[in-house]
Amino acid sequence: MKQYTVTGMSCAACSARVEKAVSKVDGVTSCSVSLLTNSMGVEGSATDAQIVEAVEQAGYGASPKGTATESENDKANNSLEQLKAAQDALVDRETPKLRNRLIASLIFLVVLMYFSMGHMMWGWPLPEFFNGNHVAMGLLQLLLTVAVMVINQKFFISGFKGLIHGAPNMDTLVALGSAASFGYSVYALFAMTAAQVNGDMDAVMSYMHEFYFESAAMILALITVGKMLEAHSKGKTTDALKSLMQLAPKTATIVRDGVEQEISVDAVKKGDIFVVRPGENIPVDGEIIDGTTAVNESALTGESIPVDKQPKDAVSAATVNQSGFIKCRATRVGEDTTLSQIIQMVSDAAATKAPIAKIADRVSGVFVPAVITIAIITIIAWLIAGETVGFALARGISVLVISCPCALGLATPVAIMVGNGKGAKSGILFKTAASLEATGRTQIVALDKTGTITSGEPKVTDIVPDETFFEETGNHAGALLAIAASVEAKSEHPLAKAIMERAKTDEIAVAEVTDFSAVVGNGLTAILAGKMIKAGNLAFVSKFVKVSDDMRAKAVEFSKEGKTPLFFAADDRLCGIIAVADTIKEDSPEAVRQLKNMGIRVVMLTGDNEQTANAIGKQAGVDEVIAGVLPDGKEAVIRKLKKQGRVAMVGDGINDAPALTRADMGIAIGAGSDVAIDAADVVLMKSRLIDVPAAVRLSRATLTNIHENLFWAFFYNVIGIPLAAGLWYPLLGWKLNPMFGAAAMSLSSFCVVTNALRLNLCRVYDPKHDRKATPDRKNKTNKPNESEEKSMTKTMNIEGMMCGHCEARVKKALEALDAVSEAAVSHESGTAVVTLSSDISDEKLKETVEAEDYKVTSIQ
């Protein structure tokens, strides 16, 4: 998406006009304009010149934020300048300008109010020259009003330009209201002068009361007050983005030819060696090549606890080196750093529109013309009713100045910006406004097991030595671990790495082995201290040694707990069992519990067999476990789940990308792959599952805030316009002075923005106020329908399945059949329980399985 800066917009009608104009340009596929950040995002093949021309023809200004044709080196070299430009764009220049305008306006307005109302209402003294000189009084008021109008000429320039281009905006309403008050007052002044020349003092006094000079000036001053408050509040909504930008280091200390030199961070290139001392910010993303330290990553992840780092660990720009001297190699520089990508995500999200904003957009497109029409009808109606021109004009002007399209236009974007900033501070990044809105509507959360619910790194959980083998050894567990580590040292298997890590932690010495050989799918063999060591699963080791019933029972127990039992034997005797498991993260059960309390159904997807999967699922507390899912099968599972409700898929790996894309909402755990992050709608910077309910909570709070803003914006206009038009005057005698209408208009936008700022108080990790599921949602997502209850199951007995991969092959083949809705396969029991959605012959089922080189012995 190409970004542009748009100038001259003052309300929602302006942004709607720009969006409509650019959308008509040939080659533009989508366009989104943000009134809040004065930015525009455009997708398509149209050139910058075409887009800028379209905006200018609509009566506004535009300029590209960057060039799409830059080379990678250019991008890196210009990253600091781009960052400075982005920071510069967020500087609040509006508030100081508006403050100066307001002060100047008030100086003239106070004098005007003294002469126009002070003497008349409270009897304040006037200079001798003005006593009885009504024409001089009128001329003084005219001059003071002209001064205020000149100071606030921006309203007239913008308002009448919009009217000329057929795109009236909020400034048009203000300009028309003020100009109408001024124009009628000038007419009254000339008429009064003529009456005084003719000696008609009754007419003179009558016309004196028809002066609306103070209204013309007061409208401008009050609207400026509202604009200043609004600009100040809008500046607060971008605080999170500005604070992120301020984190970016300006310089880096690199090592060239053995000499340290300080250079600008935008001059650092990929592969450069840089050093960071304690207390310094890390300048770019890199990998530690020398030294150890603790790094405070709270700027990026929101996690305040420092993370220990050692050689080969990754470090990110803007994080703080707290304790040690480290030397690093730059891996990502310029706009490719994690910090730059976060800033880009947050700013891109601000440039997009939430679907709910379309309501306000549709109204804003016709709002101003409708208000002008209502004002004209109001004036005509009161004149027909026999009221004076002054009375009718006052009612029409009140309609113009009380109507506020700004409140409608700001209702959604300010809440989105604040919500996005709040999320960024907590390490939760929403890529678009639509994703921030949709996350809270999730009904089903599908969790990938590995790396999401679990840590993704197998660890040794149990060491069970065979006491008969280690009769002469004191530390039996340590002795077994020493044998295992010595054999596994030459293996690249993930389970071997878990054993080596445990041996390192326990300071177990590793001996050298010879004749190492890996038996694919079974285990490995090696000679250690003259003994033939065999390691692997039960089926492999039991071919060479006798395994006692107690040890077999222990292995079954481990399997039920989701652990993988590894057997070790020396010559013809069993040494023992070491259980390895991918342990669940500490926060996973609590995260699942919170999601369930929100009324969200939680499903776990895994390629493990049913037994292992159910054990992990039970520990995590999920509602449903779908086991035996191959990497390319996750997308199909998500497709099925989407038939039951809105689905959010949470994953971290490359093989999760298709499922993340298929889901209504893709959520990537931050420690995962770049591919998964690219495919996701929401990125969790911390690898914590507890951030998933936090994201849902923040989304719901933002959506509630948007609804509140839209309600008050609509409610304000629905109540205010009839009151201003004098609808209640015949019944209750209520009428609204144009000055009070202007004051109300000023406060409406300020109130909407202030309400959005309340999102900063949202406690995203506090589950106390979570909404429960409605009965309809629960029934929809948690209960099977009648056709599912009536579905038929068949149990197939299958020979030849040896591992989880075998299970997955059989499961995939069976579920590819149209008549099969689900297949639960277990290689340990040698069965496949098939759930059928329609009739299918046993022969077809048998043929399908045997095509995968397995033998079906019976079907029940």
Positions of the model-derived regions?
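Conserved ATP-binding TGD loop and adjacent catalytic N/P-domain core of P-type ATPases
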Residues: 16, 29, 442, 528-530, ...
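Membrane-embedded alpha-helical bundles of multi-pass transporters
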Residues: 121-135, 164, 183, 422, ...
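P-type ATPase nucleotide-binding
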Residues: 460, 464-598, 610, 622-638
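Juxtamembrane coupling segments of multi-pass membrane pumps/enzymes
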Residues: 192-196, 201-203, 217-278, 309, ...
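Flexible metal-binding regulatory segments at protein termini and peripheral loops
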Residues: 1-136, 259-260, 344-352, 761-860
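Soluble-to-membrane junctions at the N-terminal ends of transmembrane alpha-helices
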Residues: 86-108, 158-181, 343-375, 392, ...
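Transmembrane helix-loop-helix hairpins at the membrane interface
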Residues: 97-251, 362, 463, 733-738, ...
